[in-house]
Amino acid sequence: MKQQAFDVIVIGGGHAGTEAAAAAARLGVQVALITLERSGIGVMSCNPAIGGLGKGHLVREIDAMDGVMGRVADKAGIQFRLLNRRKGPAVQGPRSQSDRDVYRSEMLAEMESLPNLRILEGEVADLITSGTRIEGVCLADGSEVTARAVVVTTGTFLRGIIHIGNRSFQGGRMGAAPSVRLAERFDSFGLPLGRLKTGTPPRLDKRSIAWDKLEPQPGDEDPTLFSFLSAGPHLRQVHCAVTHTNERTHEIIRKNLSRSAMYGGSIEGVGPRYCPSIEDKVVRFSDKTSHQIFLEPEGLDSTTIYPNGISTSLPEDVQEAYVRSISGLENAKITQPGYAIEYDYVDPRALDAALRVKGFDGLYLAGQINGTTGYEEAAAQGLVAGLNAALEGKGKFLPSRMTSYIGVMIDDLITQGVAEPYRMFTSRAEYRLSLRCDNADQRLTPEGLVLGCVGKERRIKFEKKMGLLDETLKKLKSFEVTPKQANEAGIRVNEDGRRRSGLDLLSLSNVSYESLAATWPELQASTEIAKQAKIEATYANYIERQQRDVMALKKDEEIEFPPRFDFSGLSGLSNELKSKLTAVRPSTLGQAARIEGMTPAALTLLLASLRKAEKRRSA
């Protein structure tokens, strides 16, 4: 029997798998990335876009740890837009349209460039175990690959079923076989499995669209990129276009709801709340007379258009009818029908904060298998699982919800579980004023440097940036003017006799760094540093208050439960909370606080119990 040995095995070459494999490889261990086909690495199975509100934050955080998604998205980007531009930096989200083929080829090139990462083609049929320790995988051809840690990133492939109207067939995505044997192996482990679903719209031939009837949507003239290492777009930039459904569209859909796989009863899994199918929109928002559709090019050399906003599981004839009822799409040709896909996922409450399956050594899960939706959420989990798999037995990388959106997501998943596919939003973070896209490197790159997953190029650029920023902020803090001097410079402040620092002046909404430097040339700084200094000044007072709250909360949040803490034996807790605490087995008081149904009184009881146990141990 053929056998190969590695330190870490990653199953799946999608967005979670590539990030996991690259992260583990950056820590210097030997990595095997096992995928059905090499050509499937980095495939964008759904929309050809990266980022967005909340999601863009995740990409920036991945990049800050020297991850690959941001760099690849910048190389493949054919349109860049900063969403929520009119709002504050804390809730702005970078987004890009990607050339699907370029994204895939650039991601493959990233994987091939890592000297200690090998790509193996094959189907994983089973996991090799010794008791509760995972020691490798068996491939369908009978060969074995061993490792001390395995990261499973199967996406929608676990017992995947594709639905188009009343027609259903097995598939992990259109044109790809599902993973059935691995799902059966998870059954044998007793893991809590559920079913979720997602969908995709029909693809259109751009040559059959009446573009002159549509509203063009250009990208930003001054594009905001994802990677702190990127200088500018690599590809020619293009426009998208906007159209809308109408009452005729809705009537066609309403008349055929019984033929939809979802409304016809074929699908058991729950779909994503924030990316509903067009059937769902028509039913749930019956008062709306139209819904927006974004027509997104799939690449510079591609004739395929992705109509974002009309995913469906209706039969092909109905898809054609409702598409052709839409302005600009009257003669549109469908090149691939839309479909829904239903798949297995593992209840993420079965995982710890390292994304390791509780009760098993060396088994990590990342991506849609954990109940999330979206490329960015998958990649962020891949980063965490890959780093922890490489650190197996030596340490852990546990991002905090106080310092990263990645930490927010993982804490939400392992504490609350999911009733529907989980999507990241800025509203999920309590400390979003300090968890901004612009400072992702300041928050996470130092941690990456300590771990050893950040390369030389990023380290040099980061250290240079921080040196200049620190110097500029010190200069602003030490520079002072009287109210009279400020008013003479056109900066309106109260004549209260109090001197203002440069940072105080810059915090005012109507004061730009450029205007300060024009009046006082000694404050000159580069465009990048000036922009960052303005943001820092704007949020300084808010963040100072937030930081005090964080420190007060952190003091109690980080108190740990002993490994075998008996929640069921605590008198004063409701049976419901005892049951939830026993199922989740939170590792810290902070994690326990976020369990659904937790009360302040119950938290006080838990804290008192922990302190009592600590006193007994130290007596």
From Swiss-Prot:
Pfam families: GIDA, GIDA_C_1st, SAM_GIDA_C. Belongs to the MnmG family. NAD-binding protein involved in the addition of a carboxymethylaminomethyl (cmnm) group at the wobble position (U34) of certain tRNAs, forming tRNA-cmnm(5)s(2)U34. This is tRNA uridine 5-carboxymethylaminomethyl modification enzyme MnmG. Its cofactor is FAD. GO terms for molecular function: flavin adenine dinucleotide binding. It is found in: Cytoplasm. FAD binds at residues 12-17, 124, 179, 368. The lineage of its organism: Bacteria, Pseudomonadati, Pseudomonadota, Alphaproteobacteria, Rhodobacterales.
